[in-house]
Amino acid sequence: HYDVGNDFYRLFLDPEMVYSSAYFTSHEATLEAAQEEKLDRICRKLRLKPGQKLLDVGCGWAGLSCWAAKHYGVTVHGVTLSQAQLDFGRAKVRAMGLEDRITLELKDYRNVADSGGYDAISQVEMFEHVGFANHERHFLEMKRLLKPGGLYFHQASVRRGGRDPIKPTPTTKVITRFIFPGGELDTIGMTVTNLGRFGFETLDVEDMREHFELTLMHWTQRLYARREEAYALAGEARTRLWLIYFALFKKGFERGSVQVYQTVAQKRRPGPSGLPLDRKSLYYDAPTVGTAKVARSAKTGLKARVAKAIASVTGSRSSKPKAGV
């Protein structure tokens, strides 16, 4: 799925190459602004501070890893199972001059050795690949890797509550056969229950269903507009399959049969959590350096260096949409 080629994903993703639900502050917001907002909210929800260590599980093309290191001053260890993503991410890290803060590896997170070494862990829409049989192991690994009182961020798509998560539907059969082999969706109730069972206190749960519907709308429009380029990169059959996959999930989020949540949990420790009692710091008192507004005003020189490094990995430049398409 992820090794179809970086150039293919660049046709419909934002410049940060974030392949997960964005966070829209309005229906008029651009995909670029919404993805930056999402990255920044993750950092705020994890209460990241300079000098802390963040483990980015399923780091993808290193969008969150780079954002957290650049804007919040943390040291990041990112792991992925995709060689294409790793090559892209490492080129981006070099171009941004963040080699001293970010380490990216081709590694299964269960093989990360630094037990109790992380202040925070992020997992953004990787959990869908874990499978029901491995849920217990997943949460126990998160617990093992976190320091006492460390924070775990969990963003994942789920089925609507009250439905049997084990029983496949016609839609999920298509998705798991052709798009995400082995993928399984639990419910938000299962997520919160498992966090409690395996050593966590759930601190915050936020519904992102309508945000993902908007994200998929943007992805569909972008990929369809550049479908001829996609045919050349991945073939017509695969491109059409992706468009069907986007349409199915967009409809699922629109109807509410599929949902997505951001959940923040803390590794249990005796006494107070040490976190603020209200949400002001998440939504109103965010540090100036970590806002999407500031990020969008970054120097063009840095953006040019990043683009050049990315082009060296992908072997080509991103093409503009053809006129009239």
Predicted regions and their residues:
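Conserved SAM-binding loop of SAM-dependent methyltransferases across substrates and taxa
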Residues: 61-72
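A short acidic, Gly/Pro-enriched loop at the edge of an enzyme's catalytic core
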Residues: 110-121
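Substrate-binding/catalytic lobe of Class I Rossmann-like enzymes that use SAM or dcSAM, i.e.
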Residues: 158-273
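Conserved SAM-binding loop
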Residues: 89-90
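A short glycine-rich, Lys/Arg-flanked "PGG" loop and its adjoining helix->strand segment in the class I
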Residues: 136-148
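Conserved class I S-adenosyl-L-methionine
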Residues: 50-58
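Conserved Class I S-adenosyl-L-methionine-dependent methyltransferase catalytic core
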Residues: 1-45
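Conserved beta-strand signature within the Rossmann-like core of class I S-adenosyl-L-methionine
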Residues: 149-157
